From Swiss-Prot:
HAMAP family: NaMN_adenylyltr (MF_00244). Catalyzes the reversible adenylation of nicotinate mononucleotide (NaMN) to nicotinic acid adenine dinucleotide (NaAD). This is Probable nicotinate-nucleotide adenylyltransferase. The lineage of its organism: Bacteria, Bacillati, Bacillota, Bacilli, Bacillales. It holds the Pfam family CTP_transf_like. Keywords: ATP-binding, NAD, Nucleotide-binding, Nucleotidyltransferase, Pyridine nucleotide biosynthesis, Transferase. Its EC number is 2.7.7.18. The keyword DNA repair does not apply. It comes from the Bacteria.
């Protein structure tokens, strides 16, 4: 059985924190690959202004292109409406019956697990992998695998705010992503 990691998110923008998490879990769990799963509309972010799918996907391609064990999974982008992890993983487990999926989440999402749509059924489809995030614990009533990673306190919301305030984002996200953001005037207001 193949072992594949999945890291979902809006990736608005993708940054070194995402890449660090994916790489650390890849090595810690001896995975074959890590798939980045960009969301169409995450249920917990409905109503928020999100950068276009095309821009987010292009930035994710730029961020992951140098790593042969990173891929992008377009499963959620092909659907309209909110992206529920249960629906996505049900599709993926049917499509790839020979894969054991390890769904990677940060400490913020570990705490939120009891509120996830159809969580009990989802636990039968994937192994959750929790990684620590500053300010959050990994306590949950559900069985999860935990992976310790070096602390790197960066988030997409922090980067959007820094761009809005015209602060430097160098060394926080891949240079090609930074160039794309600046050329396209993303996050300026």
């Amino acid at each position: 059985m193949r072992k594949i990691g999945i890291i979902g998110g809006t990736f608005d923008p993708p940054h070194y924190g995402h890449l660090l998490i994916a790489n650390e879990v890849y090595h810690a769990l001896n995975l074959e690959e890590v798939w980045f799963l960009p969301n169409q509309i995450p249920p917990h972010k409905q109503g928020r202004n999100i950068t276009s799918v095309e821009s987010r996907l292009h930035m994710l391609e730029l961020a992951t292109e140098a790593e042969e064990h990173f891929s992008i999974c377009l499963e959620e982008l092909s659907r309209k409406g909110p992206s529920y992890t249960y629906d996505t993983m049900l599709q993926l487990t049917k499509k790839y019956p020979d894969v054991q999926f390890h769904f990677i989440i940060g400490g913020d999402m570990v705490e939120y697990l009891p509120k996830w749509y159809n969580i009990e059924a989802l636990l039968n489809l994937v192994t959750f992998v929790g990684v620590a995030r500053p300010g959050y614990t990994l306590h949950t009533p559900y069985k999860i695998t935990t992976v310790e990673i070096p602390e790197f306190a960066v988030s997409s919301s922090l980067l959007r705010e820094r761009y809005k305030e015209k602060k430097t984002c160098k060394y926080l996200l891949p240079e090609k992503v930074q160039v794309y953001i600046e050329r396209n005037g993303l996050y300026e207001s």
